[in-house]
Amino acid sequence: MRWSMFAFFIAAAAAAPGAASAAGEKSPAEVTTAIYQIYAGPKGDYQTGNLDDKRVVVYLSKSLRAALKAMEARSKALNEPILDFDPVTDSQDPQVEKLAIAAEGDTAATATFFSGDVKHVVRYSFVREGDVWKVDDISGGAGDEKWDLRDIIKPGKK
């Protein structure tokens, strides 16, 4: 059941209107869908995904990749994590259920899902690099739990 619901939302997101060109370019919603497909892994349990995965990295902007690499170097020097959760699953222990991905204008997409009874909304902001949409920031949470990947990984944190 879980996998069939995932497949339904993937199909719905792929059919969503977006800023994709006729040349087969992926819209922000389609890029977001592709990231969650990679994260789901072969079992659909979201236990294998991470931002370092070479299949995910290709969807990140050059600027975001550079910022993540710089954060990793600072993290190693400090011998402690700066980014201590996974932004795609908005967790330390991934549990993604009832995933729905939607376009948010032409330059963003949101992934809405549940971890048990907890609803998560993760927003992906995109930039164009050449003719391709790339993820340039990820944010989520609300209230005191609100977070922004760029804010977390920027120099001066930790």
Task: Indicate residue ranges for each PLM-predicted region.
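Low-complexity, intrinsically disordered terminal/linker segments enriched in charged
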Residues: 102-107, 112-121, 129, 137-158
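Surface-exposed patches in mature extracellular/periplasmic domains of secreted proteins
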Residues: 43-55
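Short, aromatic-enriched amphipathic alpha-helices that serve as compact interaction elements
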Residues: 26-44
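Surface-exposed, charged secondary-structure patches
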Residues: 23, 57-118
